[in-house]
């Protein structure tokens, strides 16, 4: 049967025995899903992505049966049967006579308002819902045996095979949905985590934490009806993707909540799961598995965007989602899940604003610059140097204190909302740095400091160039050099665990990659 014939058959309401009023077709990169109330039919596409192979009719039949069998574990009443699609002459029929050309999984339709993603969008997911999901998963995992074969899926060699395949499949996306720096950093973080935490992975296997689980536990696969929680569409096509650490399943849903800007729910869900499973050790793996899962989702969105039948608007939306997932993976690799304030400081002309801007683009974080805040507060043009009279007002001790107070307030607001950000300012006085660190910690944030450095000649060249250029926001020029440099107090009070000195005279791309890799290495050591 051709794709066009199958498409037309599935979209025709008369193809179904119960004669629905309409047939709504949804395509994924692996299947056709047809909503024909009160049922849903799902037909696998003849695709082969390496980790998933539906290329023959026999394989599609086998995996359709596996889908029903496996999903009945968590959603018993929804998965009904596997129905053959047959052909007699040019006519296709569900469960008819003739040659079998495809197989469809038949399911009961779930109420649209109760899908977790839909409820989350209208602000209707709360603590009680999290506890219902946790209770469902706790009972499920308790019923799943841990055999030696299943435990092997948690071995580093097997996990590395999966992540290496991810990186191989992500590589064509470099320059489109993720940068080379992000790709290299995520790969470095992943392999460094394996190397430094081998004993942790071994302990997870030995203590029975590897289960025949779900493997694809995200918002779109959870249905929260008033009387039942249904967790459906587990992975049937690859046992190694489904037989995972319980921390891996937990991390997937937590990552998806982060992606949807519900960091509060993500943190509470992880905390409840660790308590319910008596598994505090999962917390050490959470950022690692979140990073892996964000990469998988980015990869899946890229696959979806590359499908030939996808229209231009859907392709663009999938690519943007892929970018967001890959940025999220990078955030986990360099900063973990806690709201982070990355302070980019340094003397005049060291290139800190350039660093801050590029890091913000890579990480998807907002950046607040003291130079920009100063001019916005005074309603002055950003790219015009302030007049001598204006500078006399803007750079008094009181005015400087107000600028740093504004930066501190913005940092507090972001951290309290669960968001990370970048601050770009000289931070030339120890008092400013101490106050910032104290206030970030008081609201539950973490912080790191990048101090930009450059040779004196380079700093002066950059300041001189501002006099002839038009793009600088900063008012500092070459005549201000000695005054600013002499007032700068190096951050000797900050230990090297949180201070990263950076030379800015090399190629910018290489400097950014080195910063991201260094931050990732620190994140691995903190885990």
Write out the residue ranges for each language-model feature.
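Hydrophobic anchor at the beta1->P-loop junction of P-loop NTPases
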Residues: 344
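Conserved substrate/cofactor phosphate-moiety recognition/catalytic segment
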Residues: 360-419
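Conserved lysine of the Walker
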Residues: 352
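Hydrophobic positions on the alpha1 helix immediately C-terminal to the Walker A/P-loop
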Residues: 355
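Small-molecule kinase domains that catalyze NTP-dependent phosphoryl transfer to phosphate-bearing small molecules
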Residues: 465-514, 522-527
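Conserved NTP-binding catalytic cores of kinases and kinase-like/nucleotidyltransferase enzymes
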Residues: 1-106, 111, 225-229
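ATP-dependent phospho-/nucleotidyl transfer catalytic cores
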Residues: 51-55, 92-97, 105-219, 223-340
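A glycine- and Lys/Arg-enriched "phosphate-lid" helix/loop adjacent to the NTP-binding pocket
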Residues: 386-397, 441-491
């Amino acid at each position: 049967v051709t794709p066009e014939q199958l498409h037309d058959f599935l979209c025709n309401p008369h193809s179904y025995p119960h004669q629905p009023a309409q047939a709504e077709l949804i395509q994924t990169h692996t299947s056709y899903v047809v909503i024909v109330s009160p049922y849903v039919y799902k037909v696998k596409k003849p695709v082969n992505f390496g980790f998933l192979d539906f290329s023959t009719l026999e394989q599609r039949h086998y995996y359709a049966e596996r889908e029903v069998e496996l999903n009945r574990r968590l959603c018993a009443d929804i998965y009904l049967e596997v129905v053959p699609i047959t052909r007699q002459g040019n006519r296709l029929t569900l469960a008819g006579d003739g040659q079998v050309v495809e197989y469809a999984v038949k399911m009961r339709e779930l109420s649209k308002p109760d899908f977790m993603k839909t409820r989350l969008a209208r602000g209707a997911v709360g603590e009680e819902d999290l506890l219902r999901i946790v209770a469902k998963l706790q009972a499920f995992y308790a019923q799943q045996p841990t055999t030696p074969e299943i435990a092997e899926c948690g071995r580093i060699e097997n996990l590395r095979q999966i992540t290496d395949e991810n990186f191989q499949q992500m590589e064509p996306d470099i320059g489109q949905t993720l940068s080379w720096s992000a790709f290299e950093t995520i790969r470095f973080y992943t392999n460094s985590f394996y190397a430094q935490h081998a004993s942790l992975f071994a302990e997870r296997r030995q203590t029975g934490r590897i289960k025949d689980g779900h493997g694809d536990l995200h918002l779109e696969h959870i249905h929260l009806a008033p009387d039942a929680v249904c967790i459906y569409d587990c992975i049937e096509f690859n046992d190694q993707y489904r037989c995972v650490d319980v921390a891996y399943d937990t991390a997937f849903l937590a990552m998806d909540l982060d992606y949807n800007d519900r960091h509060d729910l993500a943190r509470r869900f992880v905390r409840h799961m660790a308590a319910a499973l008596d598994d505090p050790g999962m917390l050490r793996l959470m950022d690692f598995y979140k990073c892996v899962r964000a990469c998988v989702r980015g990869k899946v969105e890229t696959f979806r965007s590359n499908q030939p039948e996808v229209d231009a608007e859907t392709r663009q939306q999938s690519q943007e989602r892929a970018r967001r997932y890959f940025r999220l993976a990078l955030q986990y690799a360099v900063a973990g899940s806690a709201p982070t304030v990355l302070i980019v400081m340094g003397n005049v002309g060291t290139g800190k604003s350039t660093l801050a801007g590029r890091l913000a683009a890579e990480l998807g974080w907002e950046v607040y610059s003291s130079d920009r805040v100063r001019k916005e507060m005074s309603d002055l043009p950003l790219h015009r140097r302030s007049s001598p009279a204006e500078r006399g007002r803007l750079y008094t001790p009181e005015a400087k204190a107000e600028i740093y107070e504004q930066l501190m307030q913005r940092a507090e607001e972001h951290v309290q909302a669960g968001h990370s950000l970048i601050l770009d300012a000289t931070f030339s006085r120890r008092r400013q740095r101490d106050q910032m660190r104290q206030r970030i910690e008081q609201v539950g944030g973490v912080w790191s400091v990048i101090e930009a450095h450059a040779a004196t000649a380079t700093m002066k060249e950059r300041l001189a160039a501002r006099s002839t250029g038009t793009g600088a926001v900063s008012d500092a020029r070459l005549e201000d050099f000695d005054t600013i440099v002499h007032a700068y107090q190096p951050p000797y009070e900050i230990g090297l665990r949180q201070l990263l000195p950076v030379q800015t005279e090399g190629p910018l791309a290489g400097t950014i990659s080195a910063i991201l890799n260094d931050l990732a290495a620190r994140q691995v050591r903190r885990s």
